[in-house]
Amino acid sequence: DIESLKKNLDRATKMAEKTGGGILVISEGVFGMRGEQGRLKEIAAIKSEYNFRFLVDDAHGFGTLGATGAGAGEEQGIQDEIDVYFATFAKSMASTGAFIAADKEIIDFMKYNMRSQMFAKSLQSVLVAGALKRLDMLRSRPELKEKLWQNVNALQSGLKKRGFDIGSTQSCVTPVYLMGSIPEAMVLVKDLREKHSIFCSIVVYPVIPKGIILLRLIPTTTHTLEDVTLTLDAFDVIRERLEGGIYKRMSAGIVAS
């Protein structure tokens, strides 16, 4: 809500003027539950009206969005307006660790003032080497991202055609919204895993309203269009079982036992 942000910036500006402090606006590049992109372009547009620094946590955007995979900022054409860019090696790079990119002044301040930096061990060299290799692959093998988006588009368009609600995702994160209880959701994902060889995470109350099940899918480059079709067929099956009350009866039996 940009209007709400402006009101908060008005208040923050008055406080900063009194205390001599500064203002940091933080947004996610991609919201991990719903897959929607942050309104980075609109936030960047008001930097001329307010004196603030802009931090973007782009865990799900880095490596998957933008012409070169630089993330949601590049996708929205405002990468140079981001003052502090944070992302992880655990998503698109399938590894461990994370990084912060910023001006040297900011990096030096963090390096010598952050508790987590001072009292933490360095990232293992094998993970650093792996991250550098994956960065090189992002730059030199654009076909990997193209294949990823081929799979993403096939999955998301296929789900929509089959009548599934996937919200308004703008990324690889593919949420599927179903109606059901937490016990039903637990039986459902077990069914997906054991009968269809599909692993996905569930999100339930209190993260989302009661009575809603959110299944969160994220395709990869190594998946095939055949995998996508199998997934779509599996979701048809689990929806039928959910709406037919099968998971409700199964979950009731588990609770009773």
Q: Which sequence ranges carry the predicted segments?
A:
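Pyridoxal 5′-phosphate
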Residues: 1-2, 15, 19, 23-27, ...
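Active-site phosphate-binding strand-loop segment of PLP-dependent enzymes
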Residues: 1-55
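Short beta-strand
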Residues: 16, 23, 86, 120-121, ...
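Conserved active-site segment immediately N-terminal to the catalytic lysine
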Residues: 51, 71-89, 108, 112
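Conserved core segment of the aminotransferase class I/II
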Residues: 84-86, 93-142
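Conserved PLP-binding catalytic core of the aspartate aminotransferase-like
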Residues: 141, 145-156, 160-196, 205, ...
